[in-house]
Every structure is written in structure tokens, then in C-alpha cells.
């Protein structure tokens, strides 16, 4: 089997911004992939190529990236007669075609669109589901269904409220299977809506980019209190734990942390040191069932990460810190600067490098959480990815907004297809392969 034709176009993501879509043809038919886009992006991410033409879509058009697929990548791939089943060979060819460290010649969004489409075509060529093909690529004999981490309260760069910390998540680790985890998550979500409406009014039930509620609160502890109440009201206090994505790089100023960063007149005397912020997290963990904190410090504050990972017995997830980049993941492992990787395919820009970063993390005993981006599409690739890579945890928003539910619904279908062979990560979500 060989790749016969590749075509790219500009479509729109869930925030109404242009993004890249790629169609790829083989003898088995046409395979389509769409590329997501982030809001709180780490400075070390691979280059998302935008045209920066201020007169068009606020500078966010992608005609150069699309052109790179159609004029450079497509003819090269077709001419090479590459086998879509050999993901590593195709991705290495794409990386060589670009030839830069952070994919700034062709664009990570151009390369990733092709890489994702190739992966889907490879599964079809083998006659297996996508998650099985991904498991094969990763060398996994098993597949595991993940615990969903529902982002039900949005703050930070994902919402127009005063909340500094970006995501407050619920993890139904006590569920028996993925279907039950969805039941718990959706029921708590609706209870949370009632709690927020009663306390803050109907306006507070507006949702952020990822489907979570965005009440106009300033105190991060209040966000945790709302979750605790909603979980109790749903009757799942024993089954549901809490995760957070702080996205601290977004409010780091002069090596301090401003929890009132959305206020242009915030008081510098109130800004916190790394140690003071770590004490805030310790208080959260002491008073709430918080089991996972992502990006607790700035993406260059390695020392603070190492200290917190040593001091606290919870999952410390590196997102902006590691940007799914195998080199930065290795640095994180060497410095013991985290104990989990947030895996975002568009941060690094190819399926092969994503698998490499995942395997490195798992081999070091780390957890891995597969993640969407705030600017998403209806593409469900990451649902199959999380099952095939056996990471045991996925965050892809609240159980609200179709671009989020598309992923959760795909995992439900996979669970149904696996039948009595389905294994759910549950309480072992941090290291499900052990």
C-alpha cells in the first residue's frame, strides 16, 4: 500500500479560528485529520505556523501551512511511494523535509495534519481499529481505557472571569468502567451548574472554551469548594477526586506569581514566591481530594518543580514545562522535576515523537495524561491515542460542547467494541500498566 494523494485546506476550530485539515488517499480510501490549537501555549512548543496578516482573521490564517502541505509535503510523499503503515518512516521523512528543530520551515500544524492522517490510513491498511494500530506502534500488547479528567470550572486564559488558575477537574477514579465514569462526570456537571446558579446567578453558568463553567470568582479555593459541594450533592464523594491545571506561566511576573493577574492594577506586594505558591498547593491537597496538579510553576522554574515533586505525594504534571518534547522530558526525568507528562500531539507535531515522549515517561515510572487543546475540532484521534498508549488518563474538557464530547463518545464506542476485554484504569490511572 502507498500514499496516493494528499490535500490540505483551512477549516475552523471550536473558537472560530482557522486551523489545518488534511485529507490523504490510499487504496483503502480517504482519511481525514484536523489539527487543534492552544490558548495557553508554552514558549517551547513546536511552531504553529500562522500567516500574521492582520487584515485576515486577526492574523490567524494558515495559507502558508496549507500551501506547505499541498506544494511541498504532498508531492514529496507521493513521489516517495511511502507505506502508510510505517508511521516512523513517514514521520522521519517529514521531519527531514522540514529540517529545523521546532518545525518552523513547514509548520508543526502542517506536519501534524499529515502525520495524523497517515496514522489513520495505516490502521485501515492493517485492517485494525486505530487504537490497536497505535498500540502496535508503541509496542503495547494491551489497551487500557482511561479515567476522564473533566474540566468543569474554567479560569485563566480559558475564561473571561477573575480566576487565575485555569482548570478545575473531576476524575471519577472510583468508577468500575468508562461508561460509569461518564455517568458520574455528567451528573456532577449538572449538580455543579445548579450550585453555581443558586450561589452566583444564571450568568455564572456561562461556559468557557472547554465547556466548563466560568463563574466570576477570584478565590481559587472557592472553585475547589464548588466542586466539593457538587460531588457531595451527586453522592460521589468516595468515587471522585480532583485535578487542577494551574497554568502558572500565564501569571508569572518577575519570577513571582500574581493570582490577580487579570486585574491591570494588581498589587505587586501580593505576588507570591514559588515557596509561597507551593504552600497554597499544600493547603489545597490537605483540605480537598486533589490528586493531580499540572503546571504549578512557570515553565522555566525547574527548581520549584523539583522541590514540589519531592515534597508532595500527588501527581505533578508537566505541560508548558515539557511541551511533549522528548529532550525536555529527558531533562524533567533527570531533574525529577515532575512525575507525569501532559501529552499534546500538536506541541511536538508528529505521532512518532508523541509516542516517543510517552514511552520515555512511562519507562521512567511517570504518569502520562493525554490532552486536547482549547481550540479543538471534531477529530477524535486522541481518544484512540489514549487507549492505544495505555496512559490511563485523558483530559478533553467538560461533558459539554460537541468538540469535547466527540472524544468521550469515541472512547465509549471503543469500550463497547472491546466488550469483556475492556480494562478501565480506575484508581491505577497514574500507572495503569503496573
Swiss-Prot record:
Catalytic reaction equation(s): (2R)-2-phosphoglycerate = phosphoenolpyruvate + H2O
Keyword terms, alphabetized: Cytoplasm, Glycolysis, Lyase, Magnesium, Metal-binding
Cofactor: Mg(2+)
EC number: 4.2.1.11
Free-text comment on the cofactor: Mg(2+) is required for catalysis and for stabilizing the dimer.
InterPro entries: Enolase, Enolase-like_C_sf, Enolase-like_N, Enolase_C, Enolase_CS, Enolase_N
Chain positions recorded as substrate binding sites: 158, 167, 294, 319, 371-374, 395
Family from the record: Belongs to the enolase family.
A molecular function GO annotation: phosphopyruvate hydratase activity
Main location: cytoplasm
PANTHER family in alphabetical order: ENOLASE
Organism: Doryteuthis pealeii (Longfin inshore squid)
Subunit structure comment from the entry: Homodimer.
Subcellular location per the Swiss-Prot or TrEMBL entry: Cytoplasm
Pathway: Carbohydrate degradation; glycolysis; pyruvate from D-glyceraldehyde 3-phosphate: step 4/5
Source organism phylogeny: Eukaryota, Metazoa, Spiralia, Lophotrochozoa, Mollusca
Top EC category: lyase
Protein's name in the database: Enolase
Residues that, per the record, bind Mg(2+): 245, 294, 319
Amino acid at each position: 500500500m502507498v500514499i496516493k494523494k494528499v490535500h490540505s485546506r483551512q477549516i475552523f476550530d471550536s473558537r472560530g479560528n482557522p486551523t489545518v485539515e488534511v485529507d490523504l488517499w490510499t487504496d483503502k480510501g480517504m482519511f481525514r485529520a484536523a489539527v487543534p490549537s492552544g490558548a495557553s501555549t508554552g514558549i517551547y512548543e513546536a511552531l504553529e505556523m500562522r500567516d500574521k496578516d492582520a487584515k485576515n482573521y486577526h492574523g490567524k490564517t494558515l495559507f502558508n501551512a496549507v500551501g506547505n502541505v499541498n506544494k511541498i509535503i504532498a508531492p514529496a510523499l507521493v513521489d516517495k511511494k511511502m507505506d502508510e503503515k510505517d508511521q516512523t518512516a513517514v514521520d522521519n521523512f517529514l521531519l527531514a523535509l522540514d529540517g529545523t528543530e521546532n518545525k518552523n520551515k513547514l509548520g508543526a500544524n502542517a506536519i501534524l495534519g499529515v502525520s495524523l492522517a497517515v496514522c489513520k490510513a495505516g490502521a485501515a491498511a492493517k485492517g485494525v481499529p486505530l487504537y490497536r494500530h497505535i498500540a502496535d506502534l508503541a509496542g503495547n500488547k494491551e489497551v487500557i481505557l482511561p479515567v476522564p479528567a473533566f474540566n468543569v470550572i474554567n479560569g485563566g486564559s480559558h475564561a473571561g472571569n477573575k480566576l487565575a488558575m485555569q482548570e478545575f477537574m473531576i476524575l471519577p477514579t472510583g468508577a468500575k468502567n468508562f461508561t460509569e465514569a461518564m455517568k458520574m462526570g455528567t451528573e456532577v456537571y449538572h449538580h455543579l451548574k445548579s450550585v453555581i446558579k443558586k450561589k452566583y446567578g444564571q450568568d455564572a453558568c456561562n461556559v468557557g472554551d472547554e465547556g466548563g463553567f466560568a463563574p466570576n470568582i477570584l478565590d481559587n479555593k472557592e472553585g475547589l469548594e464548588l466542586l466539593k459541594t457538587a460531588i457531595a450533592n451527586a453522592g460521589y464523594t468516595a468515587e471522585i477526586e480532583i485535578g487542577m491545571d494551574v497554568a502558572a506561566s500565564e501569571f508569572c511576573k518577575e519570577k513571582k506569581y500574581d493570582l490577580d493577574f487579570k486585574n491591570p492594577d494588581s498589587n505587586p506586594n501580593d505576588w507570591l514566591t514559588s515557596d509561597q505558591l507551593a504552600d497554597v498547593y499544600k493547603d489545597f491537597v490537605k483540605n480537598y481530594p486533589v490528586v493531580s496538579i499540572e503546571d504549578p510553576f512557570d515553565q522555566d522554574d525547574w527548581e520549584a518543580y523539583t522541590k514540589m515533586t519531592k515534597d508532595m505525594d500527588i501527581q505533578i504534571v508537566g505541560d508548558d514545562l515539557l511541551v511533549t518534547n522528548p529532550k525536555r522530558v529527558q531533562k524533567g526525568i533527570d531533574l525529577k522535576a515532575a512525575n507525569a507528562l501532559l501529552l499534546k500531539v500538536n506541541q511536538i507535531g508528529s505521532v512518532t515523537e508523541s509516542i516517543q515522549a510517552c514511552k520515555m515517561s512511562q519507562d521512567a515510572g511517570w504518569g502520562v495524561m493525554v490532552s486536547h487543546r482549547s481550540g479543538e475540532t471534531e477529530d477524535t484521534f486522541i481518544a484512540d491515542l489514549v487507549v492505544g498508549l495505555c496512559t490511563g488518563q485523558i483530559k478533553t474538557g467538560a461533558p459539554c460542547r460537541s468538540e469535547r464530547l466527540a472524544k468521550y463518545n469515541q472512547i465509549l464506542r471503543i469500550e463497547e467494541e472491546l466488550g469483556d476485554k475492556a480494562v478501565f484504569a480506575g484508581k491505577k490511572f497514574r500507572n495503569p500498566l503496573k
